[in-house]
């Protein structure tokens, strides 16, 4: 069975209550359930993890080598973490970077990501729909064995 990872970084455990005008009112658990539902239709396993600790995110990712795809919302670590970037490169799992808010319409320091240039794609500003679109893309990617141009 194919496996997709859903990895969420710092403060995303507060979704639903933290700045809902920016991040919406959907909780992380609800997002995880929605993503898992998209994947399960295609008999793809969804493994989820969230931590506020960069080291825990890296350690968990190291244990997931061999997964078929990664959905990554690094949160604020997108703008600061060379360590998590190196871990993503090291495990050699194709991934999409996801942000609930449009980071390019926010503070200047949020405009740079250490992940965008190594991701197969990036989604920002689409709220929960961004996660679902990323999950749908992961399904297509897995079904095409990485040959995404055949479905375009």
Set out the residue ranges of the language-model regions:
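Extreme N-terminal starter segment of soluble prokaryotic enzymes
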Residues: 1-4
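Short glycine-rich anion-binding loops that position phosphate/pyrophosphate groups of nucleotides
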Residues: 10-12, 75-78, 101-103
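Glycine- and acidic-residue-enriched helix-capping/strand-helix junction motifs
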Residues: 15-29
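Short beta-strand elements in bilobed, periplasmic/extracellular small-molecule ligand-binding domains
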Residues: 32, 36-49
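Short, glycine-/small-residue-rich phosphate/pyrophosphate-handling segment
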Residues: 48, 105-152
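N-terminal small/polar loop signature for handling phosphorylated ligands or for N-terminal nucleophile
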Residues: 52-91
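Short, acidic/small-residue loops that bind anionic groups at enzyme active sites
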Residues: 90-106
